[in-house]
């Protein structure tokens, strides 16, 4: 008895949908353990503003982690120490999910994330599906990366 290609395709699609649902549910459960999430976006100055916000929160007694992007992406830990992020492949907004899991395991009071998405569609995904910030910060908005 041969399996119809349509049945096989439908089964594969169903399995992928279930896997996607489980991953999304797990991610939402993980980020819900972070009491304060701040997402910094804008054309210029995101890394500096991310660092300043994180330093201010730490000075106020909150256990705060931060992540900056760019050519030298860094994690700023709860003590304010920079750690370089070694990437094995090119930058992708998907790394935000892995970092949120890492931060949640560290039991922070707050996480400050610099938006690493360039295209508006990816910025929306990064905010609405990955970070789900309590506070959004826009440093400035100028035409850039329009190619």
Give residue ranges: language-model regions.
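PAPS-dependent sulfotransferase catalytic core
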Residues: 40-43, 64-65
């Amino acid at each position: 008895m041969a399996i119809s290609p349509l049945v096989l395709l439908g089964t594969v699609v169903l399995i992928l949908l279930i896997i996607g649902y489980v991953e999304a549910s797990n991610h939402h459960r993980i980020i819900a353990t972070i009491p304060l999430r701040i997402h910094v976006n804008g054309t210029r100055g995101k890394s500096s503003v991310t660092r300043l916000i994180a330093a201010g929160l730490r000075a106020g007694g909150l256990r705060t982690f931060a992540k900056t992007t760019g050519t030298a992406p860094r994690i700023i830990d709860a003590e304010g120490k920079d750690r370089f992020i070694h990437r094995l492949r090119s930058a992708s907004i998907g790394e935000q999910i892995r970092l949120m899991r890492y931060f949640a395991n560290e039991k922070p009071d707050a996480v400050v994330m610099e938006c690493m998405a360039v295209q508006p569609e990816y910025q929306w995904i990064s905010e609405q599906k990955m970070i789900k910030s309590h506070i959004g910060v826009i440093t400035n908005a100028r035409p850039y990366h329009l190619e």
